[in-house]
């Protein structure tokens, strides 16, 4: 068993008291202007208007479980939650807008007939946030005005407008749409915002996954410290890591050269660190706060990534490295050590939890973002805690909405609670792995002290900084 190869910190705090509505300007850092050789641009809301930036097909959100429902990334592939006109449950997209059957029919009939209505009150009959009482007679003037305001497109009506009044009204609506700047594709619903957040997280994951897969070349070591990694621009390819050091020399008292293996532990940690730098909130934190946060979150995110990769990519029910080798494989004499045996079982906990609850990729991405943004890490000041908590609340709200869309209003909250209940298991695994690291470090030091040297092999400086907190 490789002594430092498999290796978790303060308790996780969730704030469910208030959830602000999604921020339309939610975005992640664009590093494309800093590094010309790689594209790191993460699309914000404006970029989504450009169909050339992203194809119409949703990102890969496959899961190893064939019987689950998959939420399509594109909003039009999922029935919207409410009508934008009357705020009652919608039945689909009609004339480019999420709407109910009543409002759809009313808009079509009004355009075809060309009828015009007058409000007897103050033209505020459709104002408010609560669903309109459909059992009462609605103000037709305000209802039609609301249809136009939210972006219903008269040109999408298939029935022919034969009357002169209808043609005049259609022309007026089109002119009004232009003056209001109404663009139907920009109407933002909660489903649209969730889809955009999912696509952004999927994009980040796709950028760091090659780094996670590659592993450090045998014999090479990344000599950078944690603060150097966090304070530099993203490095998503192993060959771009600055100051790679080749360490071929074995211990002085060994009779034969030490066999070198691909170091997947370091690149797994590195993938978690590099992905964190792509979130906009990271740039709002000072370097000291980022170091504190990532000393806590790196191992957690790495464990989650390793577990989901083993399930989804390797189709395995045990933890495996990207080359297919078993993670935590013990040598013959290690099997007689209860501490080693318990550790091998320990590192499987996150994977077993994901398997038991059939976590799909979107749940994994959102949950990992929640675990990354932990304002309860000791040492953070109130200003930085507020930034992190605000970011976390967005992901918590997104996960809740996703669970409601996938499992309905009855089972959705239960599924949401089930996913969040995995947090203590993952946190405890991280803490126990760090305790094991201290045990191995002391044992290794004692061994080499008896040999007359304090030489100690380590995976990397960054690894030691994270594991020794």
Curated annotation (Swiss-Prot):
Compartments where located: Nucleus
UniProt KW keywords: DNA-binding, Metal-binding, Nucleus, Receptor, Transcription, Transcription regulation, Zinc, Zinc-finger
Domain of life according to the entry: Eukaryota
Occurrences of domain NR LBD (ranges): 230-459
DNA-binding annotation, residue ranges on this chain: 80-159
Record-level GO cellular component terms: nucleus
Cysteines engaged in disulfide bonds, as pairs: none
Zinc-finger ranges (NR C4-type): 83-103, 119-142
The family this protein is said to belong to: Belongs to the nuclear hormone receptor family.
Descriptive protein name: Nuclear hormone receptor family member nhr-154
